[in-house]
Amino acid sequence: MKKRCFALLLALSLLLTGCSPLFDLYSAARGEYTRPDYSDGAISYREFQRPYQPRVKYTAEPDIEYVRPDVDGLCSTLKSIGASATGGKAAAADIINQFDAAYDDYVLFNTMGELAYLRYTRDLSDSYYEAEYTWCTDQTTRVEKAMEDCYTTMAKSSLRSALEEQYFGEDFFASYDSDGVYSDARTVALLQQESELQAQYVALQNDPAIEWNGSTHSVSELLENAVTADLYYEVLGAYYDAYGAQAGEIYIKLIQTRRELAGRLGYGSYADYAYDALYYRDYTPAQAERYVERVRTELAPVYTEAAEPMQLSALSADETMQHLHEAADTLGGEVQTAMGFLDAYSLYDITSSANKMPGSYTTYLESYEMPYIYISPEGTLADLLTAAHEFGHFVDGYVNCNQTFSIDCSEVFSQALEYLTLGSTSLGFSRAAELRQYKLYDSLETFLTQACYYAFECKAYALPDSELTVGKLNELFAECCVDFGLFDEASAEQAARSWIDVQHFFSAPYYVISYCVSNDAALQIYQLEQETPGAGLKAFSDLLYAAPESTFLAMLQDGSLTSPFDESRMQDLAAYFKEAL
């Protein structure tokens, strides 16, 4: 049994990160935009030309005032715009001006929702932001329906062609010629139900506590103070006894809700829906399942034989950010420019607190055109990789104004920056070597764990309702852990219930395959950098400008990188890791 893997799987946080890029459902025409020229050296964030300007001026995050959005007013305005478009009296220019103002309010609604979530996860005991986050979540389907109704009404109006020509773009309304997602009351109810279940899961994570030796204690504190492995696992067992059934029932309801939702939207399975509507993938669930099987057969044996890295050295939050700054200065280009922007507007939180939600993510405050990094640190060198990962998302969000729609493309930048950070800091020879070995082992482990998670999801969503029980889910997860070499059969029973801590299962179904395929692409960037210094960094920068509105395989082709689905690619990866580890 791999002790490190066991600790990772059982930790009360995500294995990698809870990345949550939010997508702009409407993209105005990108104005005249050219790639900045770094041939003369560094470019300040003040001089860097971004594709879009903020709707609200750049503001340091602590100074942003949260204001509950006027949803009633927004929905009423959108309805009025639709009526004006079909009334026959308003000119296209008038409709455009009204819609442009309403769209600013729509974006502000999404921004305030993200701000509420950010501030709630920063302090899960904050009842005000918990209530605001819940309220914004509850209002989302109502707002989206109002926006969809407005688009549908404009699509049926005599101004359709003029609106497309002057503002929306060619064939924009084509997707609104048929009934929309929010026109069906049951679909709306299912979306609301999914949001409510996700909120229940987040609340369940709010510093879970258990009865221990006659009094109530925080699980995280008990685990932190466990002096022996036996005591550590005993605490975990008590935690799963207390929370496993609750989380499991939430997940079962999510699966049932999502399967019905996919069916109502015309998809054969929820995987088909997620690939098409959520993640904009240009490969199929069938391709992903074959890929995961090759991970199992080719990489699991390598992982079983690989030597585990030593326990990582300690690293404070201040040191983590210091080294991340060094890496940005060393790498230069867009990475350095984005770091200047991050510092100028205080766009990160890496503080340590028992009240913070575990894990890390990068979000986007769209009204301000500002990415934001959230990290709950562990206090080791691993935090530098986590920070680099999230900063990779930040760089992409900053350069492209959040227009990288593909999850897989987005994850290439986050994982590639982890690799590029290796050797770009003043850690010293010993700690740099320690971090590199850890990263390569972690990379191999990423393939196995995320493929394991994906296989579990596929099996869970395939279960008929009669077999969809918490006990069956535990059994399936244990089987997957054994199949992918993460545990032997004797140890799998201990890990069987740990799936409830994988937040992606609850908040981002079928997401985890992105970690596998993007890790492959990111590793290719690292290999380029190792072969020819600067080549990997150039590939990273080139891909940044290929990513907006692209898809994963198309972006890799633009960058002359090998597809992860190439038949020989998994054998190449196995050979690489055998030599590296």
What do these predicted ranges mean?
Residues 348-370:
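Catalytic zinc-binding patch centered on the HExxH motif and its immediate surroundings
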Residues 25-319, 323, 481:
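A well-structured
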Residues 292, 297-298, 400, 405-446, ...:
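Post-HExxH zinc-binding segment in Zn-dependent metallohydrolases
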Residues 386, 390, 394, 398, ...:
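Catalytic glutamate of the conserved HExxH
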Residues 10, 14-16:
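Hydrophobic core
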Residues 37, 387, 450, 454, ...:
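C-terminal, non-catalytic "cap/extension" segments appended to globular domains
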Residues 368-387:
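Short pre-active-site segment immediately N-terminal to the catalytic Zn-binding motif
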